Amino acid sequence: MTVTRSPRYGWIKRYTAVVLTLVALSLAGCGGSSDSNDSAAQTATVTQTTPQVVVQTAEHGFDAVRVFHEASPGVVTIRSVFRGGGGAAEGSGFVLDPEGRIVTNAHVVTDESSGSRKAAKEVFIEFPDRNIVPATIVGFDPFADVALLKIEPDGFDLHPLRLGDDSELVVGQPVAAIGSPFGEQQSLSVGVVSATDRSVESLTKFQIEGAIQTDASINPGNSGGPLLDAGARVLGINEQIETNSGSNSGVGFAVPVSAIKRSVAQLEEKGEAEYAYIGVSTQPVYPQLADKLGLDTDHGGMLSEVVPDSPADKAGLEGGDKRLTFQAIPYEIGGDVIISVDGHPVVAPDDLGRYISTHQPGQTVQLEVLRDGKREQVDVTLGKRPRG
């Protein structure tokens, strides 16, 4: 039986003169962690951990009415007008601070119809009180699909939303989404955290790591709106869904608030976001595969590809040179296996990318590598992630 994955869609309403077009974000590929701009990796599986936290269930006080009452004044509708006949788009966003900064998805206020991603010609913000004002784009981060906007706050009673913490999320925790699905402003949907630490495609060929999966209904126009916890704090921004039909099927994804904080800080400082880059694609090692290959480790990231002239290539890392299908999964074997990064073990498929993302371009990491049955220490000076 052949298993295929459904397409994912970024949820804005996009208008042209005649038709409504949904912006499709194809899957980043099947696979483990990828830091190259190649998306041919195996389907990622996620290892769930359960932190010791108090889960916010209904009996602990999850009140959708209260969440909506507290958060909805800070949720806005965003309309973008694009250059060169690119039409217009509608999405959602939220007020970040009293100075008039607003957060949304980058794909709500940018367009790639001309071959490169460019900011919209005009952006307008509509508040719940029906005021509509122009906004400027401070910057956008295509890697995290985050954009920072700015309005002049004078004369407006802004309601900034509080930012939460996605590090202690647990599966089953109730959440709420507010936005403008199909242009229906100030719409609330509720659900639960279906999974954490997902990897989803960004506006580049790299992945957004740590994404939150939810069954809260997300539809066209929800993009950029907040995903909220029981305290009406922002856990993420609703970004895309996985579907066969183009309509909501209960598998939605939000960019985590930790990624939003990082993007916003860089966009405020320099108008763009930079990420460290190593230049490899990996596939996860697990006990049965390790036994099959005779590896002296039951975990790690097996290098299926090393991008030419990348930091990994310059450090001498080697990718796979042979193909093997094992337990119905194709592998590129024969390359190095990264066991740890700066002493942190690489266990889950996204661990390598997650560790690299905590660094800045120009910093050096030490990898423990399994090569030809021997363990070696390899230092890699990280580069700047390319946008292409």
Feature names for model-found ranges:
Residues 4-18:
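Bacterial N-terminal signal peptides that target proteins for export
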